[in-house]
Amino acid sequence: MREYTYAWNPIDYDDESQPILKITKSSFGSFQWCPQKYFFQYPLRMPIDQSPAMAKGSIVHNSQEDFFNTFDIKKAESMSPSEVKSYCMSLFPVDDHVDMYDTMATTATQRFVEARDEGRLSEYLPPGNEVMLDAEIVIQPDWNPKAELSRPYRVHIQGIIDRIFQEDDFYIPMELKTGPWKDYKRTMMRKEMAFYKLLFDNSSPDVLRENGLNPEYDMKYWGWYYPASNYT
């Protein structure tokens, strides 16, 4: 792979020693929201203030990652549903987001009990927990009829997938969001998950194996979880 950067120069594209454009899910979303904001935040790397919502998102995301890294299936296997719920709550920190953790623990308990009843505990923990993937794709000139290119461009895409669950011989990426669910977010979420699908499909087998994933498996479905609204 070539080096990559947000601050690329298309004039240097044919020079193999120069970096190509880097696109992440976040930078793509920022550009769609406001191209000028994207330019300040990514190519210029201007710092932005962290809002309370951003801080909350980081804390809860880290807590969910730690939850799946710590959860012991053998320990919970013989527990009653109420005991599983208490166990799940014990894996979350005690901070200002306890109400959200309670919802997340309830969801985790329901998933565990259902998996146990169906004999699918081997699929309870995600094989991918905060997985960062890298790939290269070629943008064809006619992909966007509103902004046709004069030539194809190879770009580097990168993203961190919150969770990748497995069901039989396929994967299901699941995105965690800490804000409230609104119906207008559905289009945005589909774009985010489609980005992950594109990233997964174009990652090399070696990259997938390094992240504990089977390159022979496909992503057939996707989902998102908004615990603030108890919406999946």
Predicted regions mapped to residue ranges:
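Active-site oxyanion-binding pockets that recognize sulfate/phosphate
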Residues: 50, 95, 182-186
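Hydrophobic (often cysteine-bearing) scaffold residues that line and stabilize catalytic clefts
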Residues: 52, 56, 101, 189-192
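Charged, glycine-rich intrinsically disordered N-terminal tails and low-complexity linkers that flank
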Residues: 1-83
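Mg2+/Mn2+-dependent nuclease catalytic core
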Residues: 131-232
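Sequence-level motif detector for i,i+2 pairs with an aromatic at +2
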Residues: 23-26, 35, 123-130, 134, ...
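Intrinsically disordered, low-complexity boundary segments flanking structured domains
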Residues: 26, 110-122, 177, 202-213
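Generic structural signal for residues positioned in beta-strands
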Residues: 30, 39, 59, 128, ...
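A non-catalytic, helix-rich entry segment at domain boundaries
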Residues: 59-147
